[in-house]
């Protein structure tokens, strides 16, 4: 077969060697020289960081107030239990979030099989050990399982609801990716007289919730979708439409002095660079209470004055500050 020097080779041979139910080696050849590392590295990064899956994101354990606690009759401390929960391989069918319960007492090993499951929840590794109980031990907990992608630290899920969250609900850093290990090597390949070609060998292991071959297929699809925009790239760019800012309530552009607060409260706000009413309403009560010399009495005064104007703390303004609001104005407010 004669190939033009300007024509790129495309892989014609794909081999899948199943090592175990959760591990496989995928071989792709032939590739032009250098394309083995180009494709291998791109697929590896997608498999590690962008694959969707399910994981425990929150745990509530009876008698536990924080992760540094110890439970009587339980061999592991709370931190070890939380680490073990991260090893659960869970599949949700048709749901994005679910709450599961686990309850066990008496001497023995607590495993994933002890979790009470709904009909649309599946645990792939039921033998996974969560804790070990003594004869006087008992473990009761609620687990929140959610669907996500890649790795998500607990603090990235914090929201306004955190202030009302009951004590003892422990947030977990979650790895949603079903991929446990991914490595690739590039070997030499030959087509007729050409001996400088690449052969890509990907060694992939998952947690069992996703078949390794399907994981590669999904990663390749993600890469294809991201590159599709370049395929249709046109030289003539479309005119940019400049959207006008949404009209802002004029009262938000007025200085906080117009609220006629006490001198103490007004000075505290200015010390925190809060010059306009629009600046003030975006602050929360917790943030204001952290302001030096601003106590609960001043906070109550601020809330009452805002309420009389139909405003409140903790509001969100998408287009603040507006372009018409000059920094120089703040300096003279």
Swiss-Prot record:
Coiled-coil stretches noted in the UniProt entry, renumbered to this chain: none
Matching SMART domains: RPOLD
Stretch list, region Alpha N-terminal domain (alpha-NTD): 1-234
The UniProt record lists the keyword Transmembrane helix: no
The EC number(s) this enzyme carries: 2.7.7.6
Catalytic function, reaction form: RNA(n) + a ribonucleoside 5'-triphosphate = RNA(n+1) + diphosphate
Record GO cellular component, one term: cytoplasm
InterPro entries: DNA-dir_RNA_pol_insert (IPR011262), DNA-dir_RNA_pol_RpoA/D/Rpb3 (IPR011263), DNA-dir_RpoA (IPR011773), RBP11-like (IPR036603), RNAP_asu_C (IPR011260), RNApol_insert_sf (IPR036643)
Keywords: DNA-directed RNA polymerase, Nucleotidyltransferase, Transcription, Transferase
GO molecular function: DNA binding; DNA-directed RNA polymerase activity; protein dimerization activity
Sequence similarity: Belongs to the RNA polymerase alpha chain family.
Oligomer status and interactors: Homodimer. The RNAP catalytic core consists of 2 alpha, 1 beta, 1 beta' and 1 omega subunit. When a sigma factor is associated with the core the holoenzyme is formed, which can initiate transcription.
Name used for this protein in its record: DNA-directed RNA polymerase subunit alpha
